[in-house]
Design a protein with these regions (language model features):
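Short, contiguous, pocket-lining structural segments
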Residues: 142, 173-180, 206-213, 217
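Short, electropositive, low-hydrophobicity segments enriched in small/polar residues
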Residues: 115, 171, 297
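Cleavable N-terminal export/targeting peptides
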Residues: 1-26
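Short helix-to-loop capping/linker segments positioned immediately adjacent to catalytic or ligand/cofactor-binding
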Residues: 169-173, 183-184, 198-199, 203-206
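Outer membrane beta-barrel
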Residues: 23-167, 177-179, 186-193, 247, ...
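Outer-membrane beta-barrel pore domains
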Residues: 26-29, 34, 38-50, 85-89, ...
């Protein structure tokens, strides 16, 4: 009997040690490297165009580390083009340097964080390495900034978020005369259908120098395809700009997608502007763009996306046609 009790006690102790070891292992911090590179080969097929060549658009290098208690830290460097220097040069910026706390229905971010103005639309579009999303491409706002954000998932079909940042973007982190405030809501009324609403105010030195942003998005995603459309409006100190973007993806095979997108931009000005004088209509067609292409996944880390682009300048009446082979490498 004593031997049996000893054996049972030994097994119980071993099970306790094993369970404790498993619990300790699951609670151990986990980290991962962030490595992403965007590039392409492009050629201009326009009437007077003769440019062609390889281009390294952007590289992201960083690290993310998950701690216990729902905490994680993330730092990412963005090496890419800048309007401050020659197109042949590349500059490194801190794109993310943040702490995230995630617990239950709450997610809170602080530091150099991703903004909420068009992050949802960019993920739905899904081809950031090929072409920026509408608001990013036409300078409606910045994709990252210094500040804090909080999101709350009220139900399975409704979540809300708020953000307060400097309003200068991640390339100009100094504080200005005001802050940028944003409120958003995301709805999923039925499976696959997604609706996103956003409104933001970027304070200027005076009330008439403020920038107002509003955005609405509707998208549907299924296993075989996805469809999305967004409308965006910006009033920057009286200079108004708006536009919409519609895009679609069809999954034709496990590693092959077809995609297309159409952008339309409208611009106007309430003040004197010789290029866009005020008329009966405050917003006039300014430009449009179209892109059609395919994406091929080569293994786990590489994507290749040949595509054709057309840009239409309504003001000048010129069209440009370009061919691209975009590529992505990421861990």
């Amino acid at each position: 009997m004593k031997k049996i009790k000893f054996i049972v006690a030994s097994i119980a102790v071993c099970m306790g040690i094993t369970a404790q070891a498993q619990e300790t292992k699951s609670a151990e911090p986990k980290g991962k490297a962030i490595v992403q590179t965007f590039g392409n080969f492009n050629a201009d097929f326009s009437k007077d165009g003769d440019s062609h060549g390889f281009e390294l658009e952007r590289a992201y290098l960083g690290y993310e580390y998950k701690l216990d208690g729902g905490l994680s830290v993330k730092t990412v460097m963005d090496i890419g083009k800048s309007s401050d220097v020659s197109d042949l040069q590349r500059i490194a910026y801190v794109k993310n340097a943040l702490v995230q706390w995630k617990q239950g229905k709450w997610t809170v971010n602080g530091g150099m964080i991703s903004t909420t103005q068009f992050n949802f639309q960019e993920k739905f579009w899904g081809y950031r390495y090929v072409l920026k999303s509408f608001q990013d491409l036409y300078k409606f706002g910045s994709s990252a900034d210094l500040g804090i954000s909080a999101a709350y998932k009220a139900t399975d079909w409704l979540s809300a978020d708020a953000i307060i940042v400097n309003g200068e973007g991640y390339k100009k982190v100094q504080k200005g005369t005001g802050l940028c405030y944003g409120l958003g809501a995301t709805l999923t009324p039925v499976k696959g259908l997604q609706v996103r609403l956003y409104g933001g105010l970027n304070q200027g030195a005076t009330a008439d120098a403020n920038t107002l942003n509003t955005a609405a998005f509707v998208g549907y995603k299924a296993d075989a395809f996805s469809l999305g459309a967004e409308y965006n409006y910006m009033d920057k100190a009286g200079s108004k700009q708006s536009g919409y973007s519609a895009y679609a993806t069809v999954n034709v095979a496990d590693n092959t997608n077809l995609y297309a997108r159409w952008d339309e931009v409208f611009a106007g000005n309430t003040v004197s502007d010789p290029l866009r004088p005020s008329g009966s209509s405050p917003l006039k067609r300014d430009s449009a763009a179209a892109i059609v292409g395919a994406q091929f996944k080569v293994g786990k880390y590489i994507k290749v996306a040949p595509n054709v682009r057309m840009q239409m300048d309504r003001k000048a009446g010129n069209n440009t046609y370009e061919g691209y082979v975009s590529w992505y490498f990421g861990l």
